[in-house]
Amino acid sequence: MKTITRTQTGVRLESRLLKVLKALATELDMSLGDLLEGVVLHAFEGKAPFGPPTLAKIEQLKAVYGLTLTAGDAHQMEERP
């Protein structure tokens, strides 16, 4: 196990996306920070962060929280005033 230093940060995320991420972290019994670190580290290496069972759970959570955004929407969103 590697020893690291974490920094507290404030980030703004789309509301429904955050709800799905928090629920997924709870489902996987990890913190939101751990989940985000894992997703980013996998993305940096061009690897998929989730297998089929977790992807199925994500689809369920997206339906529960009304998340319809996709990767195609990334960097194309405009925040309401």
Per-region residue spans from a language model:
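Short interaction-prone segments
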Residues: P49-L69
